[in-house]
Amino acid sequence: MIQIRVLVVDDEPDFLKLIQRRLTKRNVHVDTVTNGEAALAFLREHPVDVVILDVRMPGLSGIDTLKEIRRRFRDTEVIMLTGHGSLQSGIEGISLGAYDYILKPFSIDNLLGRIRAAFEHARLRIERRK
């Protein structure tokens, strides 16, 4: 089985530790960063399959980070992470090229299903280009 590589971008360190631990137990390779600038720098050096991207972060917003990921790393799928108050941002993310969005709080199995679907979507798109 192929191990999916995921980058989680969120400004809450405790949330990052929790998600990393829970996804790693489910055979997902997880790296974490705390802001959009760090995400873009990480992606330049370490390609991943899926980015889980918080909408609301200090500095470069999740939406602006998404725009840069779509421009520079077109084979990387993005799942926007949003709170109930920012549902519109998740929908905006979809219109800007995110694969999906998920509302906090969420179940880890729901997130894992979306990660797997995003991974498969990217894999099929890459195969069609060959």
Sequence positions of predicted segments:
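Receiver (REC) domain active-site loop signature in two-component systems and cognate sites
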Residues: M57
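Short hydrophobic/Thr-rich beta-strand motif most characteristic of the beta2 strand and flanking loop
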Residues: N27-T34, F42
